[in-house]
């Protein structure tokens, strides 16, 4: 299976909180790191944290880079109660995830101290996506997890649009 398809299927299983399909994406002895909270998980612990998270949520891969050794996804995850982004670094053993390092951050307004500085500009009007950036950078549209990934990197690391089929 092509790596972009593996990652799309992985994020579908994450959003659906499907424990058994998720388990199948990981190599034996794989580990998951969440540096923001200083946590290291075994696959079973990661499955528990993900699959027992309360509520239903959605996900959209906004960007993906792929090299021979590793992949990176930027994924928006949201529900009616929250919106976050996960920057995920995947190390592979064949077609299985050997190491997943994720950085999760809340979407929201800049902190008051920075608003007072009156610097910066909005990336998007609704604040929920990086559509404007992707259109400028890749001349593409963000994709839902159920669609094709719009960009992958070549082994040299450059970004190329992938046409929707």
Language-model region placement:
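C-terminal and inter-domain tail/linker signature
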Residues: 1-121
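Flexible, acidic/Gly-rich N-terminal and inter-domain linker regions that tether
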Residues: 119-165
């Amino acid at each position: 299976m092509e790596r972009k398809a593996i990652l799309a299927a992985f994020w579908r299983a994450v959003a659906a909180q499907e424990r058994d399909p998720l388990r199948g994406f990981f190599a034996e002895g794989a580990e998951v790191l969440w540096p923001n909270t200083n946590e290291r998980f075994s696959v079973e612990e990661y499955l528990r944290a993900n699959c027992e998270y309360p509520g239903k949520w959605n996900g959209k891969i906004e960007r993906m880079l792929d090299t021979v050794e590793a992949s990176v996804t930027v994924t928006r995850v949201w529900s009616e109660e929250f919106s976050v982004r996960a920057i995920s670094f995947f190390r592979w053993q064949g077609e299985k995830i050997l190491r997943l390092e994720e950085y999760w951050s809340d979407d929201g307004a800049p902190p008051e101290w920075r608003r007072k500085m009156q610097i910066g500009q909005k990336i998007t009007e609704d604040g929920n996506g990086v559509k404007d950036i992707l259109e400028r950078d890749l001349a593409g549209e963000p994709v839902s997890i159920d669609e094709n990934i719009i960009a992958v990197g070549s082994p040299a690391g450059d970004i190329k649009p992938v046409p929707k089929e």
